Amino acid sequence: MIVATDESQLEGLKKYQKQAEINGVDDLRMLSRDELAELEPAVVSFAGFMSPSTGIIDSHGLMLAYLGDAENNGASLVLNSPVTGGAVTADGIQLEVGGADPMSIVCKTVINSAGHGAPIVSRAITGVPAATIPANYYAIGHYYTLTGKTPFNHLVYPVARQDWLGVHVTIDLGGRCKFGPDFSWRDSLDYRFDQSREARFYEAIRRYYPGLKDGALQPGYTGMRPRITGQGQEAVDFVIQDHTVHGVHGMVNLYGIESPGLTSSLAIGRYVGELIANDRR
């Protein structure tokens, strides 16, 4: 559920509802304050809505399943093999691959889905127009875990701020509860946990869960968002480019695939497959 903690956030809820209708999500249900209190007694909110088709998954299990399907269809996972350079040629896209056994390979198809490194990979390949490659920025998100039994029955999201989703409640398949992520900029790919963020977490969470006790939060983990817009700029949607944008046949670049990239991964995969199929016609 998504909750507004005061009247000023009602416009945000209406915006979500309108976007859901545009995207074909037709099962959102607006909830009154009394209905919210019945569903989530620990949550204090002004209004909100329920998304009954939302669920949770084992993300690592999903990735292993993806890998198994890929390998069953002839793919290989090759780790520690960075793309160090390349060029667009008449025969295809030549990639210089580093690692323990450096090699040069010519590819008919390159799908650049390297997360934080996607703009870096594109810039390393001569022939990919620089004007089509976004800048890359680094933003870290911290997660804290809740000690003891979770008081929540659903995933709980506050109305988002301009550039991120806010500190929300996630419950995993084991019933464990975590809060996060927050949002702060970093100059490089730096996963260090900043314990000084703790006070801000308590403040943000208590806006909708005032029963949070001192000392109930424990440091969890961090994640880095592959941002393509910088500080002071409004967040943008995923950027997926094929030859109609950058002019390189056989290449699809995926930039800024942060949350909800995992949620969208199957749909993104189908879309990229369609782009490649259309390019080959």
What is each PLM-predicted segment?
Residues 8-11, 39-46, 87-94, 229-235, ...:
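A short, glycine/Asx- and small/polar-enriched loop/turn
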Residues 1-2, 27-30, 35-73, 94, ...:
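Helix-loop-beta segment of a Rossmann-like dinucleotide-binding subdomain
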Residues 32-33, 79-81, 219:
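Short loop/edge segments at beta-strand edges and connector loops
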Residues 49-109, 266, 275:
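Helical element adjacent to the flavin cofactor pocket in flavoenzyme catalytic cores
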Residues 91, 103-109, 113-246:
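Active-site substrate-recognition segment that forms the wall
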Residues 30, 235-281:
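C-terminal lid/capping helical subdomain adjacent to the catalytic/cofactor pocket in oxidative enzymes
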